[in-house]
A protein has these predicted regions:
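Residue register of alpha-helical TPR repeats
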Residues: 53, 95, 246, 285-287, ...
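Functional beta-strand-loop-alpha-helix junction segments that form "active/interaction loops"
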Residues: 628-631, 635-637, 709-719, 804-879
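Amphipathic alpha-helical segments of tetratricopeptide repeats
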Residues: 76-84, 119-123, 128-129, 229-236, ...
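Amphipathic alpha-helical protein-protein interaction segments
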Residues: 405, 420-428, 432-435, 439-449, ...
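An often Trp-containing, charged/polar helix-loop segment at the C-terminal end
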Residues: 944-1015
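Single-residue signature of alpha-solenoid repeat helices
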Residues: 71, 113, 222-224, 264, ...
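Structural signature of alpha-solenoid helical repeat junctions
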Residues: 50, 90-92, 196, 243, ...
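Catalytic cores of nucleophile-dependent amide-cleaving enzymes
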Residues: 777-787, 841-844, 848-949, 953
Length: 1015
């Protein structure tokens, strides 16, 4: 074979003859059909050396040494020098492409890696019969005489490595004379070429394995994999030859990657040995794939065995790619099996790898350090981490898998030392390194691209199923086996993928769209929470009453505490001290809000110390491999949501999509969906409603004349027409309670103001007149039925600038609330202990202060006496889990308070209400009252007083009415009275005297969230 790329590699004398002959022959024929006919012996490919070449080996060695970028350069050089037959690459490019893929894989460029692996597989499929042309020795395989290389253990499989020739000749046929005559090209005689067939087969297996790991379910029907599998299924090797074992391993790996583990397992098992119990070059990879099958089947203990056996086989073959993969699987399977401590194989291999395998050694040390820190041996873990060569961490490996594993071990060590700040910083680094290397994130991105591009390879049914699989909440075992990848996935912004899923699901059916939309909203909130909501989920689980948990959650909680007696003791002590402090606060009877804390200083010191210890435990558990579910917000199937609805209880939900606005009304036995035709006009009409309600300045006083003359009913009627004109539903009758799940701009709409019929002139009944109304951030939370707290502790009341007047008025307001509400006491807001820790003692919380917008985590929830005091929303979400079953924030503001002017809107309209709504429910409350705009004054105080009176009656034998009924009653009672302009900071007396406070400015800004179980 000869081509111009090879000419520098030919002997000069031979090259001159060949070139002269080529010129002579070409001159004798038209240029359109140039041919070169070489007699046997000219341009022998043997002059090019063995394939894969030594450059291939150099690239692999560079990878093992940590010089990843240099390895990629070498792999590309090797690829450029690979043989060609005409314009077609030869089989040595199979190995070269796979090596390029390995380099990109280590560098975290999964897209380029997949492209290289796919080329490798397509080349393998293009030469399906090449093994038949290999001139293998007729000698049967013999056992290798050298001792096993692994020092950390011995195989239990009763096998020995085989002594097989590395290099053999392959008979390559010459070019087809007829094809050369018709199409032009080079005509050569048959020739022999030295190759390393095991290396090529190993490259095929690696390419298939990586495709399976990187693409997962997305690659099961990929064309390159399918073509390679078809070629391997022909079993293109001599019968009864040991090359058949290579085919078994390769074909078994392909079947596994195609999602056919039952077909793969027997082939892989048979392909592990040749002859009389001899391992071969692909045995390690066969064991690795069997380990993957065992892990996928939940057989973690068996996977540990396969992985350990793979380390022995890989060491015997000096296969650095297999041995790194095998040891990574040892730890993964060990953790998935619930193993404790350092796996013996990892502990024993550290010294073995130190001299010749720098990257492997560093990765093993990082794994060992993680296990030691998890087990509580912080000193040994710190000593282990110091063994990692800093030069590696500053080079390519430090930006790759090694860097992620070392940073993760550093994080676990930080948490073991109760240094949460250091742990969080190291964990953030580990996640940042892991994110571009996450197969799940790559699969998700690729699926979105396929759908958006309109790929014919996927039907809507297939795409919807893949989205449901890839975007599903992590399974319990995901954290145990792959904590970093799982944390990287759940903390990433995947809204584009969820939006695409929703678009596909909408074409599939109503329930599919319901569930995709529910998952989208849930992820929008979770991805903005620390560690994708995992830290909060663990804190909620630890704080929960085991008697009120379902069986699965109770078992997870018991497992968390089973091996952590210190944590169990911390939780018990925390509850005991909190009980004493709650009793002390109640017994103090009206302590001054800014005076000394009721209760002993010793108890408050213990409480803060226990809270700090608990916080460190929660941080460590959330970063670790504990098998826990993220169960808030709940994610229920659409039929289950409807099943939980009571008779005459309905859910009205909305969802903004890329194409518009979808609405749905669901009852226990039916549902209706429709597209809002004038969706583009909704923001304009909501802004018009705000204007009609005199909302333009969040602090300005509104004249009674303006309120009396406002035309809010017309705006509300127009909104009602726009939202329901394309539906066949009516809200006029047959509804006891309506649960509204807004989205986007509709969070700013007080649905209570919508008219229930368009037949009457202004002044007809409103939605609130016909049914109880409450809101929920998600449809699942609308029926979540969170158990009510049996209230017996204090209810904290904080009064600040929400009322007009001097301190005496503030004191009077505080006194009215504490006297009018059972167990109400002023909420202390000290600097020490932290105010959020103090507030966690209370059973309920009402904050009557000017809070502004609380859409961000750093926004103030409860103002403090000093600049550093108070409680932020992130404080409230942080451990320890807060106790208040209800929280009232009438001093909150949203963008609606400024009339929805552009500068006031969050990046996604409505998030200034949606995010804090979920935050407050997640922190432990089952009921929350937010404000779209602040009113303040006597009316606000009376509304809160009347509402909380019902909520505070939640004793074991006297359950309160539903929150929506309590709120409706409070509005009816309070707004029937005339407002006093002297006690209303947002009201200015004009010529018009308001006979009552029924104008929606006074009450419609409040948004009641409730998901408490009705006993």
């Amino acid at each position: 074979v000869y081509n111009h790329d090879m000419s520098p590699l030919l002997p000069s004398r031979c090259g001159i003859v060949v070139r002269l002959l080529a010129i002579t022959l070409c001159a004798c024929r038209p240029l359109a059909a140039q041919q070169v006919v070489l007699p046997p012996g000219f341009g022998p490919p043997a002059a090019l050396g063995t394939r894969p070449s030594p450059v291939f080996d150099a690239a692999r060695s560079a990878l093992a040494a940590g010089a990843t970028s240099r390895a990629l350069e070498l792999a590309r050089d090797d690829y450029a020098s690979c043989l060609r037959i005409g314009g077609q690459r030869w089989i040595d490019s199979i190995a070269a492409s796979a090596m390029i893929g390995e380099c990109h894989y280590e560098l975290g460029d999964l897209r380029e890696a997949v492209a290289a692996y796919e080329e490798s597989l397509l080349l393998a499929a293009a030469y399906p019969q090449w093994l038949l042309a290999v001139q293998f020795s007729e000698q049967p395989p013999r056992p290798r005489q050298s001792p096993p290389r692994a020092t950390w253990g011995r195989t239990a499989r009763n096998t020995r490595p085989a002594q097989l020739p590395d290099t053999v000749a392959i008979r390559q046929a010459g070019a087809d004379p007829r094809q050369v005559m018709e199409q032009g090209g080079v005509l050569v005689a048959p020739f022999d070429q030295l190759i390393r067939p095991a290396e090529i087969m190993r490259s095929i297996v690696i390419a298939i394995y990586r495709q399976g790991m990187i693409l997962g379910p997305l690659g099961r029907e990929a064309a390159p994999l399918e073509r390679a599998a078809v070629a391997l299924a022909q079993r293109p090797a001599q019968p009864a030859h040991y090359a058949q074992a290579w085919i078994d391993v390769a074909l078994g790996t392909a079947l596994w990657a195609q999602g056919k583990p039952d077909q793969a397992r027997p082939l892989l098992t048979r392909g592990l040995v040749i002859g009389e119990g001899l391992d071969h070059q692909l045995t390690a990879w066969g064991l690795i794939v069997l380990g993957r099958i065992a892990l996928d089947a939940g057989q973690a203990a068996q996977a540990v065995t396969y992985a350990e056996e793979a380390t022995y086989a890989a060491a015997d073959e000096l296969d650095p790619r297999a041995i790194e993969e095998a040891f990574a699987m040892v730890l993964e399977a060990h953790a998935a099996a619930g193993g404790r401590g350092v796996p013996p194989a990892i502990r024993g291999a550290v010294a073995w790898a130190e001299r010749d395998w720098p990257v492997l050694h560093a990765r093993l040390v990082a794994m060992q350090a993680e296990c030691l820190a998890t087990g509580g041996d912080a000193r040994a873990a710190a000593a282990a981490l110091k063994e990692i060569d800093g030069r590696l961490l500053r080079a390519d490996p430090g930006r790759g898998l090694l860097g992620a594993e070392a940073a993760y071990a550093e994080a676990i060590l930080g948490y073991a030392r109760a240094d949460v700040r250091a742990g969080d910083a190291a964990l953030a680094t580990a996640i940042e390194i892991s994110r571009p290397r996450s197969p799940r994130l790559f699969q998700t991105t690729r699926l979105v691209e396929l759908v958006v591009q309109g790929s014919g390879a996927l039907s809507d049914r297939q795409a919807e199923a893949l989205f449901a699989e890839l975007l599903a909440p992590p399974a319990d075992g995901d954290f145990a086996a792959r904590p970093l990848d799982t944390l990287a996935v759940i903390s990433s912004d995947r809204q584009d993928a969820f939006e695409t899923w929703l678009a596909v699901a909408t074409r599939r059916g109503a329930d599919q769209a319901f569930e995709a939309g529910e998952a989208l909203v849930r992820d929008r909130w979770l991805s903005a929470r620390p560690l994708g909501g995992r830290r909060l989920a663990i804190d909620r689980l630890l704080a929960a009453d085991p008697a009120r948990l379902d069986a699965a959650a109770a078992a997870r909680r018991a497992a968390l505490l089973g091996n952590r007696r210190d944590l169990a003791a911390t939780l018990d002590g925390f509850a005991v001290v909190r009980g004493r402090l709650a009793a002390d606060l109640l017994a103090a009877k009206q302590p001054p809000a800014d005076g000394p804390l009721a209760g002993s200083a010793d108890d408050w010191g213990k409480y803060q110390a226990l809270a700090t210890t608990r916080t460190a435990y929660v941080a460590a558990l959330s970063a670790g491999r504990e098998a826990t579910a993220i169960d808030f917000p709940p994610l229920l199937p659409a039929p289950e949501i409807r099943r939980r609805l009571a008779p005459k209880q309905l859910i009205l939900s909305f969802r903004w999509t890329r194409t518009g606005l979808t609405a749905a009304l669901e009852s226990r036995d039916r549902h209706a969906t429709w597209e809002v035709r004038q969706a583009a006009g909704i923001p304009v009409e909501v802004a018009q409603l705000a204007k009609s309600l005199c909302l333009f300045d969040p602090d300005a006083a509104i004249s009674t004349d303006k309120l009396a003359a406002s035309g809010w009913r017309d705006s509300a009627a127009q909104l009602e027409r726009m939202l329901f004109e394309n539906s066949r539903v009516t809200l006029a009758e047959g509804i006891d309670e309506l649960v509204i799940v807004p989205d986007g701009w509709l969070w700013y709409v007080p649905f209570e103001l919508l008219p229930i019929t368009s037949d009457e002139a202004g002044g007809g009944p409103l939605l609130r007149d016909r049914c109880r109304v409450r809101y929920a951030p998600t449809r699942s939370l609308a029926v979540a039925a969170i158990p009510r707290l049996v209230a017996s502790g204090p209810i904290g009341i904080h009064v600040g600038r929400l009322t007009r007047g001097p301190k005496a008025v503030v004191a009077e307001t505080l006194d009215r609330l504490t006297q009018g509400i059972d167990r109400a006491v002023p909420l202390p807001v000290p600097d020490k202990p932290p105010a959020a820790v103090v507030a966690s003692v209370f059973d309920g919380l009402a904050v009557l202060d000017d809070l502004g917008g609380i859409g961000s985590a750093t926004a103030t929830l409860v103002p403090g006496a000093s600049a550093r005091g108070g409680i932020t929303l992130s404080d409230w979400l942080a451990p320890p889990q807060k106790r208040p079953g209800f929280i009232l924030l009438p001093g909150m503001q949203s963008a609606l308070a400024r009339g929805l002017e552009k500068g006031s809107l969050p990046p996604r309209p409505g998030d200034d209400l949606f995010m804090p709504a979920l935050d407050l429910l997640a922190a432990g409350s089952h009921t929350a009252l937010l404000a779209r705009w602040r009113v303040g004054g006597r009316t606000t105080t009376d509304l809160m007083l009347e509402f909380v009176r019902d909520a505070s009656l939640a004793a074991a034998d006297t359950p309160p009415p539903p929150a929506s009924a309590s709120w409706r009653r409070a509005v009816d009672v309070v707004t029937a009275e005339a407002p006093d302009p002297d006690r209303e900071p947002r009201l200015k007396q004009g010529e018009q005297v308001l006979p009552d406070a029924r104008h929606p400015f006074f009450w419609a800004g409040y948004l009641l969230l409730d998901c408490a179980a009705e006993r």
